[in-house]
Amino acid sequence: MNLRLLLGKGRPLSLLFSLQLLIIGANAQSHYTSSSVNILVSGTSSLHDWTMKDLKADCAATLDLNAAGQLDQLSTLSFATPVNALKSEHSGMDNNAYKALKSDQAPQISYVLSSATITQTSTGSTVTCKGKLTIAGTAKDEDLIAICKTNPDNTITVTGTKKISMSQYNIKPPTFMLGAVKTGNDIVLTFNLILKKA
Protein backbone atom coordinates (compact mmCIF):
# COMPACT_ATOMS: atom_id res chain seq x y z
CA MET A 1 0.00 0.00 0.00
CA ASN A 2 1.28 3.48 -0.87
CA LEU A 3 2.28 5.20 2.38
CA ARG A 4 1.72 8.64 0.87
CA LEU A 5 -1.87 7.79 -0.07
CA LEU A 6 -2.48 6.31 3.37
CA LEU A 7 -1.21 9.34 5.25
CA GLY A 8 -2.22 12.07 2.87
CA LYS A 9 -0.20 14.93 1.39
CA GLY A 10 2.51 16.35 3.62
CA ARG A 11 2.01 13.82 6.38
CA PRO A 12 4.92 11.48 5.52
CA LEU A 13 7.35 14.31 6.24
CA SER A 14 5.62 15.01 9.54
CA LEU A 15 5.78 11.34 10.44
CA LEU A 16 9.47 11.19 9.54
CA PHE A 17 10.18 14.25 11.67
CA SER A 18 8.30 12.72 14.61
CA LEU A 19 10.25 9.48 14.28
CA GLN A 20 13.52 11.43 14.28
CA LEU A 21 12.49 13.19 17.48
CA LEU A 22 11.66 9.84 19.09
CA ILE A 23 15.05 8.41 18.11
CA ILE A 24 16.87 11.47 19.43
CA GLY A 25 14.89 11.30 22.66
CA ALA A 26 15.64 7.61 23.10
CA ASN A 27 19.37 8.18 22.66
CA ALA A 28 19.56 11.40 24.68
CA GLN A 29 21.71 11.17 27.76
CA SER A 30 21.03 12.89 31.04
CA HIS A 31 23.12 15.46 32.87
CA TYR A 32 24.01 14.76 36.50
CA THR A 33 25.71 16.94 39.10
CA SER A 34 27.10 16.18 42.55
CA SER A 35 24.71 16.64 45.46
CA SER A 36 27.09 15.24 48.07
CA VAL A 37 30.88 15.00 48.05
CA ASN A 38 33.30 13.35 50.43
CA ILE A 39 36.94 13.38 49.35
CA LEU A 40 39.78 12.13 51.54
CA VAL A 41 43.46 12.60 50.77
CA SER A 42 45.66 10.47 53.00
CA GLY A 43 49.37 9.87 53.29
CA THR A 44 52.23 9.02 55.59
CA SER A 45 54.96 10.94 57.37
CA SER A 46 57.99 10.21 59.50
CA LEU A 47 55.82 10.93 62.57
CA HIS A 48 52.31 9.64 61.81
CA ASP A 49 49.78 9.13 59.04
CA TRP A 50 47.75 12.15 57.99
CA THR A 51 44.41 12.87 56.30
CA MET A 52 42.86 15.90 54.63
CA LYS A 53 39.15 16.13 53.85
CA ASP A 54 37.26 18.00 51.14
CA LEU A 55 33.49 18.57 51.05
CA LYS A 56 33.43 21.33 48.40
CA ALA A 57 34.32 19.51 45.19
CA ASP A 58 32.06 19.72 42.14
CA CYS A 59 31.39 16.89 39.72
CA ALA A 60 29.28 16.84 36.54
CA ALA A 61 28.56 13.99 34.16
CA THR A 62 26.58 13.12 31.06
CA LEU A 63 25.40 9.52 31.24
CA ASP A 64 22.73 6.99 30.38
CA LEU A 65 21.15 4.22 32.44
CA ASN A 66 19.94 0.91 31.04
CA ALA A 67 16.51 -0.63 31.61
CA ALA A 68 17.72 -2.16 34.87
CA GLY A 69 18.77 1.27 36.14
CA GLN A 70 22.50 0.57 35.91
CA LEU A 71 25.03 2.90 34.33
CA ASP A 72 25.21 2.03 30.64
CA GLN A 73 27.08 4.94 29.05
CA LEU A 74 29.31 7.73 30.34
CA SER A 75 30.04 10.41 27.76
CA THR A 76 31.43 13.26 29.83
CA LEU A 77 32.70 13.69 33.35
CA SER A 78 34.47 16.60 34.99
CA PHE A 79 35.63 17.05 38.55
CA ALA A 80 37.14 20.11 40.20
CA THR A 81 37.94 21.25 43.71
CA PRO A 82 39.72 24.29 45.15
CA VAL A 83 43.06 23.34 46.70
CA ASN A 84 42.19 25.42 49.76
CA ALA A 85 39.09 23.26 50.34
CA LEU A 86 41.36 20.48 51.58
CA LYS A 87 41.39 20.60 55.38
CA SER A 88 43.10 18.60 58.10
CA GLU A 89 42.90 19.01 61.86
CA HIS A 90 45.98 21.23 61.84
CA SER A 91 46.06 24.61 60.10
CA GLY A 92 49.86 24.55 59.98
CA MET A 93 49.77 21.34 58.00
CA ASP A 94 47.13 22.82 55.69
CA ASN A 95 49.25 25.86 54.88
CA ASN A 96 52.30 23.74 54.09
CA ALA A 97 50.18 21.47 51.90
CA TYR A 98 48.76 24.46 49.99
CA LYS A 99 52.27 25.75 49.42
CA ALA A 100 53.44 22.35 48.15
CA LEU A 101 50.41 22.18 45.82
CA LYS A 102 51.24 25.67 44.49
CA SER A 103 47.76 26.94 45.28
CA ASP A 104 48.70 30.54 44.42
CA GLN A 105 49.52 29.61 40.81
CA ALA A 106 47.23 26.57 40.46
CA PRO A 107 44.21 27.04 42.74
CA GLN A 108 42.29 23.99 41.48
CA ILE A 109 42.68 20.23 41.23
CA SER A 110 40.70 18.83 38.30
CA TYR A 111 39.96 15.68 36.32
CA VAL A 112 38.38 15.57 32.84
CA LEU A 113 37.25 12.32 31.26
CA SER A 114 38.39 11.33 27.77
CA SER A 115 36.84 7.84 27.59
CA ALA A 116 35.15 5.25 29.79
CA THR A 117 34.69 1.48 29.76
CA ILE A 118 31.77 0.09 31.77
CA THR A 119 31.43 -3.44 33.16
CA GLN A 120 28.13 -4.49 34.69
CA THR A 121 28.12 -6.41 37.97
CA SER A 122 25.40 -7.81 40.20
CA THR A 123 25.71 -4.81 42.53
CA GLY A 124 26.27 -1.97 40.08
CA SER A 125 28.71 -0.85 37.41
CA THR A 126 32.50 -0.78 37.39
CA VAL A 127 33.76 2.15 35.33
CA THR A 128 37.33 2.40 34.07
CA CYS A 129 37.93 6.04 33.23
CA LYS A 130 40.73 7.49 31.16
CA GLY A 131 41.26 11.19 31.53
CA LYS A 132 43.47 14.13 32.39
CA LEU A 133 44.27 14.84 36.04
CA THR A 134 45.70 18.27 36.83
CA ILE A 135 47.44 18.91 40.15
CA ALA A 136 49.70 21.86 41.01
CA GLY A 137 49.49 23.02 37.40
CA THR A 138 50.79 19.73 35.97
CA ALA A 139 48.44 17.62 33.83
CA LYS A 140 48.88 13.86 33.44
CA ASP A 141 46.88 11.09 31.80
CA GLU A 142 45.43 8.95 34.58
CA ASP A 143 43.20 5.88 34.70
CA LEU A 144 40.59 5.90 37.42
CA ILE A 145 38.35 3.01 38.49
CA ALA A 146 35.00 3.83 40.09
CA ILE A 147 32.09 1.76 41.36
CA CYS A 148 28.69 3.23 40.48
CA LYS A 149 25.44 2.16 42.11
CA THR A 150 21.97 3.53 41.37
CA ASN A 151 19.97 4.28 44.52
CA PRO A 152 16.19 3.92 45.06
CA ASP A 153 15.78 7.71 44.68
CA ASN A 154 17.53 7.53 41.26
CA THR A 155 20.69 9.20 42.50
CA ILE A 156 24.01 7.50 41.74
CA THR A 157 26.67 6.74 44.34
CA VAL A 158 30.22 6.79 42.98
CA THR A 159 33.09 5.39 45.06
CA GLY A 160 36.73 4.56 44.50
CA THR A 161 40.37 5.11 45.39
CA LYS A 162 43.40 6.31 43.47
CA LYS A 163 47.07 6.21 44.47
CA ILE A 164 49.13 9.17 43.29
CA SER A 165 52.84 9.95 43.54
CA MET A 166 53.44 13.63 44.28
CA SER A 167 56.75 13.66 42.41
CA GLN A 168 54.94 12.82 39.15
CA TYR A 169 53.21 16.19 39.45
CA ASN A 170 56.38 18.06 40.33
CA ILE A 171 55.26 18.37 43.94
CA LYS A 172 57.85 18.37 46.68
CA PRO A 173 56.35 16.44 49.62
CA PRO A 174 55.67 19.00 52.37
CA THR A 175 57.51 19.02 55.68
CA PHE A 176 56.39 20.16 59.12
CA MET A 177 57.92 21.29 62.40
CA LEU A 178 60.79 23.10 60.66
CA GLY A 179 61.56 20.08 58.51
CA ALA A 180 61.66 17.57 61.36
CA VAL A 181 58.59 15.76 60.01
CA LYS A 182 58.66 14.66 56.38
CA THR A 183 55.72 13.31 54.41
CA GLY A 184 55.89 10.34 52.06
CA ASN A 185 55.80 10.73 48.30
CA ASP A 186 52.64 8.67 47.76
CA ILE A 187 49.12 9.78 48.64
CA VAL A 188 45.78 7.99 48.33
CA LEU A 189 42.66 9.73 47.08
CA THR A 190 39.40 8.18 48.34
CA PHE A 191 36.14 9.51 46.93
CA ASN A 192 32.46 9.03 47.68
CA LEU A 193 30.11 11.12 45.55
CA ILE A 194 26.37 11.20 45.05
CA LEU A 195 25.19 12.38 41.64
CA LYS A 196 21.65 13.57 40.98
CA LYS A 197 19.89 14.40 37.74
CA ALA A 198 20.31 18.06 36.91
Segment roles from a protein language model:
Residues 2-15:
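Bacterial N-terminal signal peptides that target proteins for export
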Residues 6-8, 23, 67, 177:
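Intrinsically disordered, low-complexity segments enriched in small/polar residues
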Residues 12-24:
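Bacterial N-terminal signal peptides
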